[in-house]
Swiss-Prot record:
Protein name as annotated: ATP-dependent Clp protease adapter protein ClpS
HAMAP family linked to this entry: ClpS
Organism whose genome encodes this protein: Ruegeria sp. (strain TM1040) (Silicibacter sp.)
Gene behind this protein: clpS
Gene3D superfamilies registered for this protein in UniProt: 3.30.1390.10
InterPro entries in the record: ClpS (IPR022935), ClpS_core (IPR003769), Ribosomal_bL12_C/ClpS-like (IPR014719)
Reported function: Involved in the modulation of the specificity of the ClpAP-mediated ATP-dependent protein degradation.
Length: 113
């Protein structure tokens, strides 16, 4: 006598047993990102702003010059978008460097949308 495998439900119309169990993984949320902004002032030389952009944000001269012009014309520019810790560090580095060179350059961060 041949034995049939034992099934959870031998009734084909019974949908209470869906068969496979799946484990749902919780979705990992990405950490919030922060924009680092440079603000225009009437005293910081344009070339100093270019140096800051090259030194602390790794931009080439042309990229740094473009952002410096945006800061000059529009009053501010987004320099980059980073994790909170990186943005905070960059703001502190720029502000410290500007102070040490006696420039009033302002750098801030805000949460990216």
């Amino acid at each position: 006598m041949l034995m049939q495998p034992l099934m959870m439900s031998d009734n084909p119309d019974d949908e209470s047993d869906l068969g496979l169990l799946t484990k749902t993984r919780p979705r990992t949320q990405r950490p919030p990102r922060y924009k680092v902004l440079l603000l225009n002032d009437d005293y910081t030389p344009m070339e100093f702003v270019v140096i800051v952009l090259e030194r602390f944000f790794g931009l080439n001269h042309a990229q740094a010059f473009e952002i410096m012009l945006t800061v000059h014309k529009k009053g501010l520019a987004v320099v980059g978008v980073f994790s909170h810790e990186v943005a905070e560090t960059k703001v502190a580095q720029v502000m410290d460097y500007a102070r040490r060179h006696q420039h009033p350059l302002q750098c801030t961060m805000e949460k990216d949308d």
